[in-house]
Every structure is written in structure tokens, then in C-alpha cells.
Amino acid sequence: MHEETSNSTLQGKTSFSIADILDPAKFNGTRETREISNNRESPKTTSPTQDPSAPNIANASAAKVKSKRIRTAFTLDQLRILERSFQSSHYLSVFERHCIASALGLSETQVKIWFQNRRTKWKKELDGHGGEEQSHCAPTALTQNPIMYALPGHHANHHVHYYPQQTHYLNTSFHPQTLMMY
């Protein structure tokens, strides 16, 4: 008798007890949603929910399409400035990131991710060399070599592409106003 009384008082409400949640007799397979439009409520019943264990090919292919992102192709000028900024400092302040992004026409997220990837590459280069050779990977050693300068991110075939570095970039310290000179 007590169960009948409690069930009658809960008819308009949802019970969150474990027994009620796991009871298959209380699950009817539909969901009710309410949409408020012009201060008027109208209940809508959606189609029965699908079995989560059933394969859903349409959703799987849609998820692959959504996760596919176009890779950013940086120009040589953008890479020069990004590399020069990285040689100056391996970590950017919010202000520096904003200045570089606006000067290069990139989003701050693109600049941030480029720096993260470049730091990862730099750390791998440090780990790959012995103690004596680590000094060759230091920022000062790289900036003192005006002949060749490696482009980041071209590691698909394990080939490193080089381009000659212009010497006037070497003596320019990072400053937001100097970015436009590059």
C-alpha cells in the first residue's frame, strides 16, 4: 500500500533512485522535450532512442568529416618571423602572441600551436644529441649561423628543407613594431 501511494505522488516527477533508473519496465524508449516559444510551452515527443550498442554508420562518417581539419600552410615570411620569435624566446606572452598573430594574419591559436609544436621539435633535437652537441641547438648557436636556417614542420619524409637566412634578421631583437619590417 505504501508503494502505491508513493508511485501516485511521483507520477509527474522523475525518480532518480538506482532501482528506478535501472528498471526496464519504467523506460518507454521516448524522450520528452519542452520548447518555449513566445511564452508558450508545447511538449514534443522525439522518436524512440536508438540502442547505443547498435552501429550507426551515418554518425561515424559524420564524425570523421567533422574531425578532419585543414592543415595551416604557413608562408616563408610567416615562418621566418615565427622562427625568429622562437629564437628570441621559446615562450610567448599573451601580448607577444597577439602582436605576432595580427602582424602575420594568423589566429592567436595558430601561433600558440606553432610555438607548442616548435618547442616539442626543439626538445627532441636536444634529447637526440649528446652533451657536447647540445650547445649547437641552443638559440644563440642557431642565430649565429647566417648560412642555413631550417624550416619547421616538414618532416613527412624525414627531409629537412633549408633556405638561406638573410642577415638583417639576425640583429633584430623581438619587438612588436619590428614585425612589420620582415
From Swiss-Prot:
Gene Ontology molecular function terms on file: DNA-binding transcription factor activity, RNA polymerase II-specific; RNA polymerase II cis-regulatory region sequence-specific DNA binding
Disruption of the gene: reported phenotype: Morpholino knockdown of the protein results in impaired neurogenesis in posterior regions. Expression of the neural precursor marker ngn1 is reduced at the one- to three-somite stage. At later stages, there is a significant reduction in islet1-expressing primary motoneurons and defective axon outgrowth from motoneurons. Formation of Rohon-Beard neurons is initially abnormal but later recovers. Development of secondary neurons is not affected.
GO cellular component: nucleus
SMART domains: HOX
Chain residue ranges for the region called Important for interaction with tle3a: 1-34
InterPro entries in UniProt: HD, HD_metazoa, Homeobox_CS, Homeobox_NK-like, Homeodomain-like_sf, HTH_motif
GO biological process, one term: negative regulation of DNA-templated transcription
Matching Pfam families: Homeodomain (PF00046)
Protein name: Homeobox protein pnx
Species of the source: Danio rerio (Zebrafish)
Gene: pnx
